From Swiss-Prot:
Protein function: ATP-dependent chromatin-remodeling factor that specifically binds to the promoter of target genes, leading to chromatin remodeling, possibly by promoting deposition of histone H3.3. Involved in myogenesis via interaction with MYOD1: binds to myogenic gene regulatory sequences and mediates incorporation of histone H3.3 prior to the onset of myogenic gene expression, promoting their expression.
Keywords: ATP-binding, Chromatin regulator, Disease variant, DNA-binding, Epilepsy, Hydrolase, Myogenesis, Nucleotide-binding, Nucleus, Phosphoprotein, Repeat, Transcription, Transcription regulation
Protein name: Chromodomain-helicase-DNA-binding protein 2
Acidic residues composition bias: residue spans: 234-243
DNA repair as UniProt keyword: no
Subcellular location, principal: nucleus
Composition bias, Basic residues: 175-204
Enzyme Commission numbers on file: 3.6.4.-
Domain notes: The CHD1 helical C-terminal domain (CHCT) may bind DNA and nucleosomes.
Species of origin: Homo sapiens
High-level lineage: Eukaryota, Metazoa, Chordata, Craniata, Vertebrata
UniProt subunit comment: Interacts with MYOD1. Interacts with histone H3.3.
Amino acid sequence: MMRNKDKSQEEDSSLHSNASSHSASEEASGSDSGSQSESEQGSDPGSGHGSESNSSSESSESQSESESESAGSKSQPVLPEAKEKPASKKERIADVKKMWEEYPDVYGVRRSNRSRQEPSRFNIKEEASSGSESGSPKRRGQRQLKKQEKWKQEPSEDEQEQGTSAESEPEQKKVKARRPVPRRTVPKPRVKKQPKTQRGKRKKQDSSDEDDDDDEAPKRQTRRRAAKNVSYKEDDDFETDSDDLIEMTGEGVDEQQDNSETIEKVLDSRLGKKGATGASTTVYAIEANGDPSGDFDTEKDEGEIQYLIKWKGWSYIHSTWESEESLQQQKVKGLKKLENFKKKEDEIKQWLGKVSPEDVEYFNCQQELASELNKQYQIVERVIAVKTSKSTLGQTDFPAHSRKPAPSNEPEYLCKWMGLPYSECSWEDEALIGKKFQNCIDSFHSRNNSKTIPTRECKALKQRPRFVALKKQPAYLGGENLELRDYQLEGLNWLAHSWCKNNSVILADEMGLGKTIQTISFLSYLFHQHQLYGPFLIVVPLSTLTSWQREFEIWAPEINVVVYIGDLMSRNTIREYEWIHSQTKRLKFNALITTYEILLKDKTVLGSINWAFLGVDEAHRLKNDDSLLYKTLIDFKSNHRLLITGTPLQNSLKELWSLLHFIMPEKFEFWEDFEEDHGKGRENGYQSLHKVLEPFLLRRVKKDVEKSLPAKVEQILRVEMSALQKQYYKWILTRNYKALAKGTRGSTSGFLNIVMELKKCCNHCYLIKPPEENERENGQEILLSLIRSSGKLILLDKLLTRLRERGNRVLIFSQMVRMLDILAEYLTIKHYPFQRLDGSIKGEIRKQALDHFNADGSEDFCFLLSTRAGGLGINLASADTVVIFDSDWNPQNDLQAQARAHRIGQKKQVNIYRLVTKGTVEEEIIERAKKKMVLDHLVIQRMDTTGRTILENNSGRSNSNPFNKEELTAILKFGAEDLFKELEGEESEPQEMDIDEILRLAETRENEVSTSATDELLSQFKVANFATMEDEEELEERPHKDWDEIIPEEQRKKVEEEERQKELEEIYMLPRIRSSTKKAQTNDSDSDTESKRQAQRSSASESETEDSDDDKKPKRRGRPRSVRKDLVEGFTDAEIRRFIKAYKKFGLPLERLECIARDAELVDKSVADLKRLGELIHNSCVSAMQEYEEQLKENASEGKGPGKRRGPTIKISGVQVNVKSIIQHEEEFEMLHKSIPVDPEEKKKYCLTCRVKAAHFDVEWGVEDDSRLLLGIYEHGYGNWELIKTDPELKLTDKILPVETDKKPQGKQLQTRADYLLKLLRKGLEKKGAVTGGEEAKLKKRKPRVKKENKVPRLKEEHGIELSSPRHSDNPSEEGEVKDDGLEKSPMKKKQKKKENKENKEKQMSSRKDKEGDKERKKSKDKKEKPKSGDAKSSSKSKRSQGPVHITAGSEPVPIGEDEDDDLDQETFSICKERMRPVKKALKQLDKPDKGLNVQEQLEHTRNCLLKIGDRIAECLKAYSDQEHIKLWRRNLWIFVSKFTEFDARKLHKLYKMAHKKRSQEEEEQKKKDDVTGGKKPFRPEASGSSRDSLISQSHTSHNLHPQKPHLPASHGPQMHGHPRDNYNHPNKRHFSNADRGDWQRERKFNYGGGNNNPPWGSDRHHQYEQHWYKDHHYGDRRHMDAHRSGSYRPNNMSRKRPYDQYSSDRDHRGHRDYYDRHHHDSKRRRSDEFRPQNYHQQDFRRMSDHRPAMGYHGQGPSDHYRSFHTDKLGEYKQPLPPLHPAVSDPRSPPSQKSPHDSKSPLDHRSPLERSLEQKNNPDYNWNVRKT
């Protein structure tokens, strides 16, 4: 490896003349060196080993060295170049060269020997001399067409083969030019790295700036084209490259992985000529040189299966045909995609073998459609940027050292491809795209140099000119071929006049009259006539976006229009290249077209521009002035507004006012005034309203303006139901008898559900009960079954047969997508060619389906459409027949559908057939709806062509049901009585009728000019024969029968009996059902896991089916409480789910409804509706939680058991909601909401004030970035990182979500950081007292999620008394590290945690020594105070909650300032720095142990560093005599030390003391041998039990068995082990407390334990038993003792021992009380310890911490004697038990000092008993158990 590197260096210096360019490109390619070398080695098949090794040696710098040099030494070894260097290097080079030549296999270099056939990419510079054949693969495009301006000039293979290493550069360029495709035949030097580079170029990152950083290039490259080049190394047989092995430096490794191309997609397959693969098969290569597989004869030539591959990072134009063999040789990535493609192909082949020829034909047509799309992707739609190779050194595909002037200046263009989003843009060579798409390049340059760009100086913006009418169409509109119709020119004049008068207006022409063209003409008029160049903003629905784009190109090509849609990356690309001129900072575009959704997502960007014109298509989306879309758009700065809608009035005058208020807020300011003026207008036909509207609204209808439009004739075809439909219809009514019988007392939604079911039944039986698979056999039977299941389909079948014969083309509309599925199946079986458009068909496919149907000579016979899909602007005028299969609630919706065919351009009469099922709800709905439509037409002639509902004057009601309960009841009864007269099973089939007879009976009349709006509306329905006035009177006078008269009793009874049976079954099945649902709920985490979604889905569907018959079913026990559907009217379940998801992202969500609406895509909903839903969720959750808590109080066992921690769930409509997660999120984000200022100016200055731990990201990250991140979360919602990234005000664009996914911070790191910052905020607000009262309670509830173990050590260590505080948290993930870093969730933090834990253990070993003297002195005082402790307890609780305190012997507790935390002022820091200089080396090494150390060695390393540092600090402190000074400087110095590691000062100090103690113990053990242990020196982390004794004497003096011996620990037991007492009596020493020892254990265990049996540090295998230790002892006095145990750094609010139980997840808690309660009840079965045999612990294996031999502890065997202080603790714990048995000796007496354990406990020689107790106090104990 080194040799190769040296060789490269030598060459590098020998090529000094090219140094500058070479270095630049080397940066870009340095990490690719391995791959480069490999490609260059293969560059010259004929040059022999010399050239081979030469290229190899140059490999690492192939990009950087001038190929002219290599040409000179074409066949020479590297030797000559090396001569200039010292001999040793020369020898090494020669040595390497020789080895490469002699043992190519060893180094994987063998390829170099063979002429490696590089895919012959289209060689642009072909005609260049050998020098021009430089090996630099230019960008794929460049490579291909570099110099050769014509595609035709691809060099012959011979020529290519002549390219020796000297000529390899150009060749590489070729290679690079197009997506590298392996071409066996043409040996080409593969410069792998170059493809990458090329990729980088293509990246949209490469801006057209002249000087992109070279070092950025490699990143871009890797990202952009993962390893393209693989495809070029054709003949690689070896898995490893020698180059990679040899040259592997750190970077090389990454690059090596990038050597190969990646398959992105397999597009097609074929049988092709063997070897006709690779670069020669790209589109442009075939155009230039012909298809290598063109003369393939399957009979004579050898063939192979080939696949059309779209390569990752290359555009579609570079797709190549490859065989499996060629792909494997190139070692491409993504072969799994090929396997999947082959599998799918096999399935299709099998299917094609079984189906009829017509099906095969249909399949082939579909394939053709798909391949047409792929061809479209090879067409450049627009060029958006240019760069020359010179400007992007290091990013181009040809080497920077190339001397060729042409390539260095040859431009590359960033191309947007037709039909693909901007994110798919790619850089292409001019030579490649210039040939075919020169017009795109020209238009790009003309746009770039255009002077017609928006400017604020335009006079017309400030002062409108006088209006001059256009008498004829101006020349700038549409050129010579396009002509505006008269009424369109009139419309243009009206728009221009309004603009001159400063009136914003509504263009409300009927659909089909060309509103789009009139608007574009108006913008062109402003552009040309008044030099107003924009910016114009046009907001349109997605469905009409392409037609707007197309019309702009046709009618106003001079206007630079940008279509602003796509994903985040696409929009970023648009803003980077299409937005502003980098020099002038002026906007580039004149008009911007976008959609409502994108407008809301990027409202900050779009809202910052001053728009000269704002146009909104389909403007009835703005009818709700309370919706987010409305509120957002009305705030946009615009000089003129135009609303384009065919339906200005939908449900009420309020909606008309909303539109008027939007365009002219000053004139139509208040709805109340408008209503007062015009609300009563129906008496005079709204004449006053007409007058007011006149200047602001223009509406023409087709029959007024388009005399040439052929007639439209509508016929209603009434059909009978089939026998099966009749059965189903009766069955639906009978099953719902109870709901129906309630009449007006029933629920509207219940009735609507029944109506919908009946409407489905009228359409087709399969909508009610789909057929079983096995019921459907051959095609003919399927067809018959399909047709017989619907009376409408029987008629349609006959109708279509007739229409097909006549050559008509048909549009078939249905509201129900499932009905469209059935019709599609019918048409497929009948082999009628058709297209389909519904909501699921998007974008390009939709557009292509429309184009295909409208194309000249199209064979499509039918077009299936969803009545509401596709927006209004869809033109299907090539059809002349419309079939309305099922009518909408509102027939006007169907008028919109008809207008798709009956519009301008239609030459034939349009026949409309409306199918209605006779005697059913369908017929009645049409009749009633028709009558309700009349009022609408009195205001604006036939304005409602899409109205979902019927006009009601003042109600803003916009739900989709226009009927009230009474009407719904009447509709349901219509026809039912006659139906039930037919006996069950005897339903008659509809009579066979001739289609001509049917059409004759449905009397046909043409549209006539109506005398009134009402007549005109009604004339839409040619139904005079079917619904005469008498019928209507009859309808009104029809006697109202009750349902029990309509539905025969026997059928009702039959259904009731079935229901009863079903209920009985349910009762039997209940336990099973309950357990399964319970399981689903309990095991869910709070996050939206898949299982939860499934549960929600099932519950949603359950509720949908059960809502209507809830009365009939027994309520299931345990079912979540649910909120009725009608309480969330206007929201679907999917919308509610989205709302809840967004609700959890914001603080105080009820005040952030607009943000929630935007996030949940509910912008059409009014704020009132959103608020109603938000309040419903909040209130339901709060009450559910209260109920749950009450239940827990009543029945404590309810909340126990696994899975119960999840808390209650509720159901809102069909959506199941976890109450706890909602409330938790509300609390978490409330703090953020409170801390962010409301004032926008203040908000910009917002900065975190608390100290924040550093974030270890790959970018600079400071407190400002944290503050901006919080601001982003506040503005855009938690988790919406992409929006935060793109918000320019936050300035985080370059910092978060880097494109390289291995860089941080990605989403996961941001989430972790955000969680940490939110916790800091909460702490900060607590401190400030901002949180009071109820909020404090909330915080307590949340606390279980925040561990603050660090507070424990602090009190102990600094104040000498072990003051307990209950644990703050049971959440393992937030232990310890949360306080420091908040990054507890990331894997790195886990490692840090381990390290920290390890060190804590060491620390704790010695942490008692300093305080021992204090403790001993205070014991006697504590004894006196002890009896008061009971009284003190309650008061201390309240005090404790305020924070840690100093406790001194003679005074009240003094609070410790929490902010004395870990920061030093500059002066103190400098002093500390100087004092610690002698141990600088230890400080640096503290957190960086050498790599390769094992666990034990790492531990020793850390311990030694700490000891050096701690000893130095102790030395520094000797200078002080005053205790206060000593404390202060000890603290300062340790804080200084903490800057070198992740741990805080307290932890480090504690770790040092533990290590110090251990050291002194080990020294003592060397001197003394314990006679009990037989001279062995057991490792004892604790010197004695004195720490426990001191604890006992402090906290339980009144119970002490030997009160007269306060210092007893000094002389008992431990002496037996030879630990001198002075260790414990020394004033500066103190012993372990339980908590400390627990920390020590945990730290040791978690640092070195995970799976590692490292003897000295114990094992983590035993924790499963520790849980049982609790069970073996009474803890009656537990609460009393708690106050004196567990470390002092924990929060002191005792009251929160089990705070808010139900709020914690089940793994967060092992409730202490559970154990206490259980074991009190258990006492009968358990013997107290006094009555157990001495070796009980040894026998009871549940209590044993380990059963391994004790060889782990410095090789010592088991100890027969355990330390006597265990018995102290035993005595202490036992004292709540009954009085000691007289026979039992005092635990402190000498006989008792023998350990009850005969075998040594691996847990630091402590009994499981004391460990269990201490661990119960230790916040980390549960953590251990859980983790284990």
